[in-house]
């Protein structure tokens, strides 16, 4: 990742996530924290659970564990002490979930703490406590314009805060076209030289891998092997489902970044069937690696992919299977999509662009706080 220019005034920035497990938004916070630190700011992740401690430490980010896994008076007081006059003494706190809004709102009652809500869920929070706490939010960051408009339509109270659309970014120097890495991955996994499909993400119900398996089963036999990168509660049921359908599905678990780059470059096509995806980092990584993408055209995916991928009707395995069959048979189209994919990722979804956009708004908010203080 290239160096990014320094800030005018160093800020103390907390990244608050009460998530129990490492999620895509956790990874974004880690990358963002490192990027903002590179601009001269002091960044600290504030978490509730050990998996998050290890995850942020693996990204060389300072971490503080607090009892913020639930909306409780104990957790709120601990957070207020840490972010207010405690060792963190933050100027700005970026929050990940509705619970984090509530906790940060309490922490900001006696200090000019700036709260920034980075929403990454398909639907906005609408419970009464969060609506009241939202009065303390200075800015909401949306991943796509589609997500912003849906949130405003379903939760009009969110219009109280300023907002900005900032797509997530990936390291386009790491995630890049690499034929040698792709060949090596195929060799290690015994995938041969034929077509290979790739899906990346947690093996959880919201990802709708069942739709993907049903879609692949519509391809004229023999269907290409499908590699699934990720872990989760549904692995057993997905294995059974694949066996019933007679599909060759390789469950390879969660891969480190270098191995994941190989997986993307080994893929003939990267496939994604979640119908309400907000913003898939896996699709951005695939674009950065110059891979043809076929995805369900729901949620924020059409805005994310644009003309650099193929969109299928959401929730329709028959249509998805037909489009997949056509794409596998059309080498020229795949080659054109690969070029468009890489170009779109570099132009729109680099880490450098994401950090610059966040730095612009966070530094402006921090300067305003300093003047008020």
What are these regions (language model features)?
Residues 46, 292-295:
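Short hydrophobic beta-strand element within catalytic cores of glycosyltransferases
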Residues 95-101, 119:
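Short His-centered aromatic/hydrophobic patch
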Residues 146, 169:
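Carbohydrate-associated surface elements
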Residues 254-255, 262-267:
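Short alpha-helical donor nucleotide-sugar binding micro-motif in glycosyltransferases
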Residues 239-255:
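Nucleotide-activated donor-binding/catalytic signature segment of Leloir-type glycosyltransferases, i.e.
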Residues 275:
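Aromatic "clamp/platform" in nucleotide-sugar-dependent glycosyltransferases that forms part
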Residues 307-318, 326-331:
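Conserved acidic donor-binding segment of nucleotide-sugar-dependent glycosyltransferases
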Residues 14, 191-207, 213-216:
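Conserved donor-binding/catalytic core segment of Leloir-type glycosyltransferases
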């Amino acid at each position: 990742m290239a160096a990014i220019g320094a800030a005018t005034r160093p800020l103390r920035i907390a990244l608050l996530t009460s998530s129990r497990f490492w999620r895509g938004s956790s990874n974004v916070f880690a990358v963002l924290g490192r990027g903002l630190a590179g601009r001269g700011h002091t960044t600290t992740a504030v978490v509730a659970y050990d998996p998050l401690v290890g995850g942020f430490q693996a990204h060389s980010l300072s971490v503080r564990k607090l009892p913020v896994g639930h909306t409780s008076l104990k957790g709120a007081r601990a957070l207020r002490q840490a972010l207010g006059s405690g060792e963190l003494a933050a100027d700005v706190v970026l929050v990940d979930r509705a619970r984090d809004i509530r906790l940060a709102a309490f922490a900001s009652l006696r200090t000019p703490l700036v709260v920034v809500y980075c929403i990454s869920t398909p639907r906005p929070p609408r419970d009464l406590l969060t609506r009241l706490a939202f009065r303390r939010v200075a800015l909401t960051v949306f991943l796509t314009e589609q997500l912003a408009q849906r949130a405003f339509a379903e939760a009009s109270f969110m219009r109280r805060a300023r907002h900005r659309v900032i797509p997530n970014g990936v390291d386009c120097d790491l995630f890049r076209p690499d034929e040698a890495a792709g060949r090596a991955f195929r060799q290690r996994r015994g995938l041969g030289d034929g077509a290979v499909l790739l899906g990346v993400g947690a093996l959880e119900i919201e990802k709708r891998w069942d739709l993907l398996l049903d879609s692949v089963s519509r391809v004229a036999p023999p269907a290409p092997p499908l590699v699934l990168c990720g872990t989760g509660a549904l692995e057993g049921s997905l294995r059974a489902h694949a066996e019933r359908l007679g599909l060759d599905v390789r469950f390879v678990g969660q891969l480190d970044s270098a191995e994941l780059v190989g997986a993307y470059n080994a893929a003939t096509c990267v496939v994604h069937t979640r119908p309400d995806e907000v913003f898939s980092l896996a699709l951005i990584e695939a674009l950065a690696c110059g891979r043809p993408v076929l995805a369900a055209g729901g949620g924020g995916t059409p805005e994310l992919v644009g003309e650099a991928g193929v969109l299928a009707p959401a929730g329709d395995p028959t249509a998805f299977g037909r489009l997949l069959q056509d794409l596998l048979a059309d080498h020229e189209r795949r080659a054109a999509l690969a070029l468009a994919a890489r170009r779109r990722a570099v132009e729109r979804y680099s880490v450098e662009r994401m950090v610059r956009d966040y730095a612009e708004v966070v530094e402006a908010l921090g300067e305003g706080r300093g003047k008020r203080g």
